[in-house]
């Protein structure tokens, strides 16, 4: 955009400030590129994400740990005129709209709370000797107790002893809701006093009257709901004046005259309660389901005494627990909890509330809550005292999350209680072992055996036979109902629990049956030992083995990727035969089936065996191995060449072998077959006997007969069948196969040309294992590859019609040293040698269409030197037994 130049307004020879600012502006201003309509910058996107993450509907999750308001639960139960019936559904928690406060508005009759000071509780050591609670007059602002049942006495532990001076009172809050929510000054002062007590780490010396201050939570609400069922089944006994337990939140319902009820079967769909370590202290329990229109269940008010939201535990004489865990005592409470829970860390355990699991056993919920609170308080004691065993005196324990603030003291439990709880713990562990054994027997064998737990106590292992049968406890019944065992498995578990270790001793009949079972697999394995296969799929055999009770194996004639060829004696004809045993691999079995198809076609076209191809006598399947039976031949022309130290065949033998080979392949081509795997290894002598003579003082083997047969039709392909991209062995592979231009019968002619060169020289023409090097050797021996083929190929071997080959590389040096033009390989210039190389040159033409056909090759002048008697194939007489030298 253009910039208008303005004159500099000078006053007194000095330029003005505006003029200097204009001079500093850039000469060219590039307008900012306009964003699209819905463009959101990175900063704005961050703000939007932050706003989405804010959620005020759940203060328990998105508020601080230190906020009391976020940790409150509805504490005052909804009163109902009718008693709470016993039901199998969990206690519902009334739904609270998110826009309302966490606690309901208090009634005008509620009074503010007076909290004791720390020093007021820890002083007066003389009160330790008192054995009973000292009643104190209730002031005008005393707590208003809830209605009591007739005949029951519920004592409220006062906040202070009567002998102590009155503590400083806090300013009353407008309501209990403000006190509980932490919005008033009372919550701040309580938090400050709690911090002061933690810093002093002093012990509470008052032993006569202990006050437990408890902020209600969902855990306590569920615990009180569990205790509500007890008055209906059993009347509450009159509790004695014993000291209340410091583990306030969840033990109270069980110790206020509500004995544990046997748990009812739990529904199969009810999920199990997660482990204690998995419960999050800030997790909000889900609302339990209840029927539509049903009123919320009311808690009995006779078991809880409240003063403006602060609950005091009623005293009870029942200190026993039935959960199988040892209570915390004055001498070894922390150790007992560590032994029971297997925990040595000081991790704070959730006491606010766990996910509400539908359960039919309300006392079981109380047991779980008791475990949570006991472990929490014991670990808190250990952390505050800094020792493994808590001190004898009580101390102030507070939850870091603000759920519980209580003055805990030592529990007064007897040795009988400890023994009873140990027995329950051992019984529960034995039950788990029994259930595990029942599942293992259901999945495996039918013998029920128990699994020993290394962590189990020695008491359960002593005198297993002398222990009388014990009835199933409530824990066992609850466990079985939770797992929903089938009837058969449940019967086994009951038998194991009733009989103890007697079920571990199997009967003699069971042992005899178990010993008799392995005999059947041994018979099968003994039958299979004769037909074992190795890791590659080859049949494992030894000399003298029988196949189908007809063929006796003598020795191995050859081995390849397809399988093995063995010499066998046919008991029917008493002659030696060659048995080709294919690998027990699906790929080679399918190839063998194709070979059988080709051999059957050749036998049909050549019933008199006049075309120099091998014929199959019979075939059969032997334990997954397809076996093909042939006439016994001699060694291959490659094996004989190798045994003769790669001395080339004489010219007359080369002439005869070439004639037979061209006629055999021509017979295949006439029947629309392509062999695709022509090589010296697949050309066998009918009789490979020889004589040895010295030539230049070196032994030289001379064959008696050069009659050959063409074998291995496993890769033979009919013209109408699918043609694989890559065929033939590497050294005898045609260029059109390497360049992936498609192949047909001329690829066999190329292979014949390579074989003729090897017969004449004794060495392989193209000794390589890489396509690019193979093409380079072809160009070195035969000249450049035609441009048409180079352009048609889809391979990456050519650049601009020329082979991508570096002549200065080490590979190029190897090609130059080992390859030379074809004519330079002639040993002499005799007419027969020249004629042979003419035939080889015509067979090794790059273009498949320009390559010599086999009928033309058989008319070549080179074969005019062959005697007529050698042009007729020899007859294979089954009565004769061809032998290999050395047999």
Swiss-Prot record:
<keyword id="KW-0539">Nucleus</keyword>
<feature type="compositionally biased region" description="Low complexity">
    <location>
        <begin position="108"/>
        <end position="118"/>
    </location>
</feature>
<dbReference type="InterPro" id="IPR011009">
    <property type="entry name" value="Kinase-like_dom_sf"/>
</dbReference>
<feature type="compositionally biased region" description="Polar residues">
    <location>
        <begin position="314"/>
        <end position="332"/>
    </location>
</feature>
<dbReference type="GO" id="GO:0004674">
    <property type="term" value="F:protein serine/threonine kinase activity"/>
</dbReference>
<feature type="binding site">
    <location>
        <begin position="557"/>
        <end position="565"/>
    </location>
    <ligand>
        <name>ATP</name>
    </ligand>
</feature>
<keyword id="KW-0808">Transferase</keyword>
<keyword id="KW-0418">Kinase</keyword>
<keyword id="KW-0829">Tyrosine-protein kinase</keyword>
<dbReference type="InterPro" id="IPR000719">
    <property type="entry name" value="Prot_kinase_dom"/>
</dbReference>
<feature type="active site" description="Proton acceptor">
    <location>
        <position position="677"/>
    </location>
</feature>
<feature type="domain" description="Protein kinase">
    <location>
        <begin position="551"/>
        <end position="863"/>
    </location>
</feature>
<dbReference type="InterPro" id="IPR051175">
    <property type="entry name" value="CLK_kinases"/>
</dbReference>
<protein>
    <recommendedName>
        <fullName>Probable dual specificity protein kinase madd-3</fullName>
        <ecNumber>2.7.11.-</ecNumber>
    </recommendedName>
</protein>
<feature type="compositionally biased region" description="Polar residues">
    <location>
        <begin position="356"/>
        <end position="366"/>
    </location>
</feature>
<feature type="compositionally biased region" description="Low complexity">
    <location>
        <begin position="407"/>
        <end position="419"/>
    </location>
</feature>
<dbReference type="GO" id="GO:0005634">
    <property type="term" value="C:nucleus"/>
</dbReference>
<dbReference type="GO" id="GO:0005737">
    <property type="term" value="C:cytoplasm"/>
</dbReference>
<dbReference type="GO" id="GO:0005524">
    <property type="term" value="F:ATP binding"/>
</dbReference>
<dbReference type="InterPro" id="IPR008271">
    <property type="entry name" value="Ser/Thr_kinase_AS"/>
</dbReference>
<feature type="region of interest" description="Disordered">
    <location>
        <begin position="347"/>
        <end position="475"/>
    </location>
</feature>
<dbReference type="GO" id="GO:0043484">
    <property type="term" value="P:regulation of RNA splicing"/>
</dbReference>
<feature type="region of interest" description="Disordered">
    <location>
        <begin position="163"/>
        <end position="299"/>
    </location>
</feature>
<feature type="compositionally biased region" description="Low complexity">
    <location>
        <begin position="217"/>
        <end position="241"/>
    </location>
</feature>
<feature type="compositionally biased region" description="Polar residues">
    <location>
        <begin position="177"/>
        <end position="192"/>
    </location>
</feature>
<keyword id="KW-0067">ATP-binding</keyword>
<feature type="compositionally biased region" description="Basic and acidic residues">
    <location>
        <begin position="367"/>
        <end position="377"/>
    </location>
</feature>
<feature type="binding site">
    <location>
        <position position="580"/>
    </location>
    <ligand>
        <name>ATP</name>
    </ligand>
</feature>
<feature type="region of interest" description="Disordered">
    <location>
        <begin position="313"/>
        <end position="333"/>
    </location>
</feature>
<keyword id="KW-0547">Nucleotide-binding</keyword>
<keyword id="KW-0723">Serine/threonine-protein kinase</keyword>
<feature type="compositionally biased region" description="Basic and acidic residues">
    <location>
        <begin position="121"/>
        <end position="130"/>
    </location>
</feature>
<dbReference type="InterPro" id="IPR017441">
    <property type="entry name" value="Protein_kinase_ATP_BS"/>
</dbReference>
<feature type="region of interest" description="Disordered">
    <location>
        <begin position="504"/>
        <end position="533"/>
    </location>
</feature>
<dbReference type="GO" id="GO:0004713">
    <property type="term" value="F:protein tyrosine kinase activity"/>
</dbReference>
<comment type="similarity">
    <text>Belongs to the protein kinase superfamily. CMGC Ser/Thr protein kinase family. Lammer subfamily.</text>
</comment>
<dbReference type="Pfam" id="PF00069">
    <property type="entry name" value="Pkinase"/>
</dbReference>
<keyword id="KW-0963">Cytoplasm</keyword>
<feature type="region of interest" description="Disordered">
    <location>
        <begin position="77"/>
        <end position="147"/>
    </location>
</feature>
<feature type="compositionally biased region" description="Polar residues">
    <location>
        <begin position="439"/>
        <end position="462"/>
    </location>
</feature>
């Amino acid at each position: 955009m253009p910039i208008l130049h303005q004159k500099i307004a000078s006053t007194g020879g000095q330029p003005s400030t505006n003029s200097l600012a204009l001079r500093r502006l850039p000469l060219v201003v590039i307008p900012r590129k306009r964003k699209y309509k819905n463009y959101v910058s990175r900063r704005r996107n961050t703000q939007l994400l932050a706003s989405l993450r804010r959620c005020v509907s759940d203060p328990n999750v998105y508020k601080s740990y230190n906020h009391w308001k976020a940790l409150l639960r509805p504490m005052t139960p909804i009163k109902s005129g009718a008693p709470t019936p016993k039901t199998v559904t969990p206690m519902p928690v009334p739904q609270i709209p998110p826009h309302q406060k966490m606690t309901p508005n208090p009634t005008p009759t509620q009074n503010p709370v007076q909290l004791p000071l720390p020093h007021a509780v820890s002083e007066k050591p003389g009160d330790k000797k008192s054995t009973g609670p000292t009643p104190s007059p209730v002031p005008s602002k005393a707590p208003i107790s809830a209605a009591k049942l007739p005949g029951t006495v519920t004592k409220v532990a006062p906040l202070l002893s009567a002998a102590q001076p009155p503590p400083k009172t806090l300013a009353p809050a407008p309501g209990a809701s403000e006190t509980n929510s932490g919005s008033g000054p009372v919550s701040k002062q309580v938090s400050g006093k709690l911090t002061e007590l933690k810093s002093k780490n002093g012990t509470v010396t008052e032993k006569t009257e202990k006050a437990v201050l408890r902020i209600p939570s969902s855990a306590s609400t569920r615990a009180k709901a569990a205790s509500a069922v007890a008055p209906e089944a059993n009347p509450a006994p009159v509790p004695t004046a014993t000291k209340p337990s410091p583990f306030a939140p969840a033990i109270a319902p069980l110790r206020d005259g509500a004995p544990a009820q046997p748990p009812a079967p739990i529904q199969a769909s009810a999920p199990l309660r997660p482990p204690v370590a998995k419960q999050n202290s800030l997790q909000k329990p889900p609302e339990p389901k209840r029927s539509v229109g049903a009123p919320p269940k009311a808690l009995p008010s006779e078991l809880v005494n409240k003063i403006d939201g602060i609950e005091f535990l009623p005293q009870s004489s029942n200190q026993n627990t039935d959960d199988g865990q040892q209570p915390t005592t004055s001498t070894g409470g922390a150790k007992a909890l560590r032994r029971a829970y297997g925990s040595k860390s000081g991790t704070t355990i959730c006491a606010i509330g766990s996910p509400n699991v539908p359960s039919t056993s309300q006392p079981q919920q109380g047991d779980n809550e008791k475990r949570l609170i006991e472990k929490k308080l014991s670990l808190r004691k250990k952390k505050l005292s800094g020792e493994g065993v808590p001190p004898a005196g009580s101390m102030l324990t507070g939850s870091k999350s603000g759920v519980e603030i209580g003055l805990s003291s030592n529990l007064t439990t007897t040795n009988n209680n400890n023994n009873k709880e140990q027995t329950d713990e051992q019984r529960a562990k034995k039950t788990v072992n029994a259930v595990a054994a029942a599942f293992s027997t259901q999945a495996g064998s039918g013998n029920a055996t128990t699994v020993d737990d290394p962590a189990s106590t020695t008491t359960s292992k002593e005198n297993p036979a002398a222990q009388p049968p014990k009835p199933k406890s409530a824990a066992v019944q609850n466990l079985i109902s939770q797992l929903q065992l089938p009837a058969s498995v449940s019967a086994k578990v009951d038998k194991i629990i009733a009989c103890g270790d007697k079920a571990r001793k199997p009967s003699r009949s069971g042992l005899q049956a178990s010993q008799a079972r392995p005999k059947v697999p041994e018979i099968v394995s003994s039958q299979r030992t004769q037909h074992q296969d190795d890791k590659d799929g080859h049949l494992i055999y030894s000399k003298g083995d029988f196949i189908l009770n007809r063929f006796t194996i003598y020795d191995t004639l050859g081995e390849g990727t397809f399988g093995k060829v063995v010499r066998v004696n046919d008991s029917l004809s008493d002659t030696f035969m060659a048995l080709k045993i294919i690998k027990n691999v699906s790929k080679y079995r399918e190839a063998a089936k194709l070979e059988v198809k080709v051999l059957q076609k050749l036998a049909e076209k050549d019933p008199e065996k006049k075309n120099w191809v091998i014929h199959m006598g019979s075939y059969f399947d032997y334990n997954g191995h397809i076996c093909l039976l042939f006439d016994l031949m001699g060694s291959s022309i490659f094996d004989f060449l190798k045994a003769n130290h790669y001395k080339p065949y004489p010219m007359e033998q080369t002439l005869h072998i070439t004639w037979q080979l061209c006629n055999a392949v021509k017979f295949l081509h006439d029947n629309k077959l392509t062999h695709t795997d022509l090589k010296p290894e697949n050309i066998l002598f009918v009789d490979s006997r020889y004589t040895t003579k010295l030539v230049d003082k070196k032994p030289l083997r001379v064959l008696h007969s050069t009659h050959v047969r063409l074998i291995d039709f496993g890769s033979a392909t009919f013209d109408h069948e699918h043609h694989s991209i890559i065929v033939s062995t590497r050294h005898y592979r045609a260029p059109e196969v390497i360049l992936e231009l498609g192949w047909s019968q001329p690829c066999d002619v190329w292979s014949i040309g390579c074989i003729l060169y090897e017969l004449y020289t004794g060495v392989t023409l193209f000794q390589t294992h890489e396509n690019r090097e193979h093409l380079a050797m072809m160009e070195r021996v035969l000249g450049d590859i035609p441009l048409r083929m180079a352009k048609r190929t889809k391979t990456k071997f050519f650049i601009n019609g020329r082979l991508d080959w570096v002549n200065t590389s080490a590979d190029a040096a190897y090609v130059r040293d080992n390859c030379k033009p074809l004519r330079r390989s002639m040993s002499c210039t005799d007419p027969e040698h020249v004629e042979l190389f003419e035939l080889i040159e015509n067979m090794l033409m790059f273009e498949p269409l320009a390559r010599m056909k086999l009928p033309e090759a058989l008319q070549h002048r080179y074969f005019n030197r062959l005697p007529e008697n050698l042009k007729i194939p020899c007859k294979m007489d089954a009565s004769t037994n061809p032998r290999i030298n050395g047999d």
